[in-house]
Amino acid sequence: MPKSNDRINLTNQFLIAMPNMADPTFSGTVVYLCDHSERGALGLVINRPTDIDLQALFNRIDLKLEIEPLLHVPVYFGGPVQTERGFVLHDASENTYTSSMQVPGGLEMTTSKDVLEAVASGKGPERFLLTLGHAGWGAGQLEDEISKNGWLTVEADPKIVFDVPAENRFEAALALLGISSSMLSGDAGHA
């Protein structure tokens, strides 16, 4: 584990689950890290669509969505923490939303309903991914999982988040490292 003065910052990175991932919740996932600090980390799983679409979710929260192309956009499982709460990962915009976190790389993560109201009215971000829940790690927990070969890390590419079909995001994230899933092994060691 790095010393505190050697701390790495994994904000704006993809975490790619290795085959030996101990937690089945994260098996086969790609997580976009929105925040990573000495206090812990927060990320969103980007490749697990649920059976809920925007229309169903918006109906649940009393928002009228009339933009035809968005009706059947899936809502994603963002992680096992706060699964009843929505998290919207989107391109940074000139609009200011009540509760947004800017992420290096030109993205924002917003948790306030005003971003959903903007989407419903056609004035929201053009590219977005809506999740229910998020992934969270306490201080040192993610670093420990990485040191035990639970995750690969690579700088995130927003095109993978927004433009690649969900079922191809795992392989697309691995391709950023120049590898494919057929090259991964559950066995690992340290030199």
UniProtKB/Swiss-Prot annotation:
InterPro entries: AlgH-like. SUPFAM superfamilies: VC0467-like. Pfam families: DUF179. One of its GO terms (cellular component) is cytosol. NCBIfam families: PRK00228.1-1, PRK00228.1-2. HAMAP family: UPF0301 (MF_00758). Belongs to the UPF0301 (AlgH) family. This is UPF0301 protein Bphy_2327. It comes from Paraburkholderia phymatum (strain DSM 17167 / CIP 108236 / LMG 21445 / STM815) (Burkholderia phymatum).
